[in-house]
Structures are given as C-alpha cells and as structure tokens.
C-alpha cells in the first residue's frame, strides 16, 4: 500500500456528562484554585489575577483543535519582516492569541523574521533547524514540550510548533528548577490541562504595577493554578503580549516602542461554523425509526437540520459496526445533542466517506464483526479506534478503486437517565 496516497480523516465523538459542561466561563481566584464559568459562550476563558506583585493574564481555550501557530509570512523565507500580534490575529481571522517563538535578529535590526528553531504553522515547516526546545501540538491535539528533533516532530505528527523554552512542565512534573534559573521579568507561556484545554498566559513585567515573574513562578502557576500537565516558556520581555476580543489585553514592557514585530504567534480560530446557542430544541430526535432518548435541557446546540444529519451518520456508522443503535440497544446508548459540528463542507465529506453506498455500509457490517482482525480496536476505556485501510478494500472483490485510509475514534458513555449532555465532534 502506498502510504503517501493515503488520506487520513479523524473524528472524535464524545458524550460529556452534565457535571462537566454546566455554567458560563469567567474566572475568580481562591487561594488554591480557580472557579470558572462561561458568560459569553465563546468557549474561551479570559482570566486576570495578581501573583506575587505581578499581573497575570490567561486565556483557557477549551477546544485544543482551535489553537494553531500563525506566521508573519505565509511561506518560508530567509528574509522578511514580522508583524505585531494584533495584525497577525486580524490577518488570520483569529479571535485570540499570544506571542510564541523567537526570531533571528539579523544585524540587530529587530525585523521579527525569520523564526528561530523548529517552527510549524498549520503543517508547514518554516525552519531548517534540526533540533531544539519546542512547544507543539500534534494532529491529535496533544501538546509536546521539550527537546525534539525535526525527525521527532515528523514521527509524532506535529502540526503546529515553535522553538523556545525552557519546558516548564512535562507529563505532569515540573522541570528541575536548577536547569532554568531566571530573573524576574515579563513572561509568556503555553500549557495544556489533562482534559486537553490549552492555557495561554502572559505576565506583565518591569513596570510599576507589575514586576514580573521567574520561570519557576510560571511553572507553579501553570500546575498549581491551572492544572497543566505540559507547559513551556515562550519568548518574553518586550515580545510578551496577548490579544483577545479584538484588542491587545496586556501592556508591553517597553511602552515607548509599543508591541514588537513577531515572527509567529499562538492563535485561536473562531468557533466552528454551525455552532449556535439554542433557546429550544426538540424533545426527541428519531433516526431510522429509533428514538435516541428524550432530551429535556440544553445549554448549547446546533440547528436541528445539521443535528439530524450528524446523528444519521453516527447511528448508521455505529449500527453497521456494533449494532448499538438497533432496536434492542437504543435505550442503553444514545447521544443527546451536538455542542458544535465541523463546517458544512467538511461534515458532508465525512458523511459521504462513511455512507458512500449501502454496499460499503453492508461490507463494514459483515467485516467488522471480528474487531481484532478488521481494524476496530478497543482502547479499554469505552472508546474504539476504527481503522479501515486500503489493504482491506484492495483484498475485497467488491472494490475496483482505491479507498482512503480512515481512522475514527468513537467514545460511548452509558447514561440513559442523563437529561443534559453533549456530543462533540472534533475537526480533522
């Protein structure tokens, strides 16, 4: 099989319990923890507090797939100019962001370009550097922090990354502080919580109202305040800046020169198309004659037409593979409603792939009974990785064309009496 010709599409379906998804998102500090709610529904927490005499700004992005690296130039180039964070955010149509990696200050000109070290922006490699300390997100939206080579990045599937450091937290453990002693100053850091949410943090420094923090302080905040399991320091000083809700949030440590031109930034895309708040939703959704369960209350939902299309895809797929949504089983496992869906064009492509015709669905149904031999693997936690490879199809007499390699992760939670829940689809 020619792996270069394989197209991989990944979708994640997750039903979340009421206790996870209630409330609005704002931040209030206690001595040891944060109380979070969501008032505006943008799924981003905008949070500000004081830490040891320093002003700390934080954005918590609940969906890590929305976070990516934007660059001042769209393609790799040896020479050019960086741009300010607000200009970069507007260039990409981003709703939020922070500065990211450093740049090679050629001749001391302060041009903000090219980026230093390994840099990936939406899958494009902007640097020929072989290795270095990085902060990156792979295609499964997991954050990596620490030293990675270019080959490492390719092997683990890094989609977005910048080269800077030091790593502050790796796999839940704060890095040895003796390895990154620092003075007090303006700082930028990025981290990821265990639930996948991305934490972006900027600390003002070298100013009368905010003296700044050390690297060790950043690690403490990331772990003790935000619960990050991986985190990395980003470029600080005059580069430290945050953008949210159409404006710069913090103050540059160099008020005279203003914000610095940057080579890249961690940006946040808008909510996916189709995400809307719903005042009311139908009491039931019936697909193929099977009621998926009574729905009493929602906080967020997409429109009914899109919901029904996505439910049809989910039900057809699961019925073909497992029979979960047959007449006998529909009372035990059911999704309730979509929190958001992928853009309409992507949703249609995903459905077309899964439901190309009845022959494909029937073939899935007959070949997937033996899940170990036909690419359906239980992860042991209620989720399944469904992998259909070109090899499988090429061995079948039914196919006279090459089929794509598809990976689908499905997570089901048994909760027949739940009155509120979510079915979340991740972009792919």
Where are these regions (language model features)?
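Bacterial N-terminal signal peptides that target proteins for export
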Residues: 2-13
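Hydrophobic core
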Residues: 14-22
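Zymogen propeptides
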Residues: 27-127
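Active-site-adjacent helix-turn-beta-strand microarchitecture at beta-sheet edges
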Residues: 30-40, 99-180
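N-terminal low-complexity, Pro/Thr/Ser-rich intrinsically disordered segments
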Residues: 30-48, 276-309
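Conserved, well-ordered active-site substructure
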Residues: 107-129, 178-233, 239-281, 285
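Core segments of small alpha/beta cavity-forming domains
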Residues: 287-364
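Exposed beta-sheet edge and beta->alpha loop/turn motif
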Residues: 377-428
